[in-house]
A protein has these predicted regions:
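Short alpha-helical segments that sit at the start of domains
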Residues: 10-39
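Short, cationic-aromatic polyanion-contact patches
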Residues: 27-36, 52, 85-107
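Short coil turns linking two alpha-helices in DNA-binding domains
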Residues: 27-28, 63-68
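Short, hydrophobic-biased segments on the C-terminal half of alpha helices
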Residues: 71-72
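A short, conserved structural fragment
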Residues: 75-85
Length: 114
């Protein structure tokens, strides 16, 4: 991507604000401070592993409240799915294109650091 000519700081701020107000898929997901930590933890779970919010919180090193705050986002973006008729509610990593792409991105990033 080529560098664009210098912009006026106010224009750059307006562009940034516009992106934040209408985020693309990646920004929509990662604009939340704890979501990358949750996704990183989810990507290290064994396939098919079911978990509660408390178990995910312990695995990720965050509070249960943090997991509760972002559960709807993780469900909405097909990263996790709820196990029907589970009590307490249980979740698992979704078998979705989003998760597949996250695994591939994670692997590529890990490989680039070797």
């Amino acid at each position: 991507m080529s560098e664009s000519p210098s912009k006026h700081p106010a224009v750059e701020k307006d562009t940034k604000e516009a992106r934040l107000e209408n985020p693309s898929g990646v920004l929509y997901l990662f604009q939340h401070e704890s979501v990358p930590i949750l996704i990183d933890a989810i990507l290290t779970l064994p396939p098919g592993r079911e978990f509660t919010k408390t178990e995910l919180a312990d695995h990720a090193g965050v509070t249960r409240q943090t997991v509760s705050k972002y559960t709807d986002l993780l469900l909405e973006t097909d990263i996790v799915e709820e196990i029907p008729n589970s009590s307490p509610r249980r979740y698992r990593v979704a078998k979705s294109t989003v998760v597949q792409e996250l695994f591939e991105l994670n692997s590529a990033l890990n490989a680039s650091g070797e």
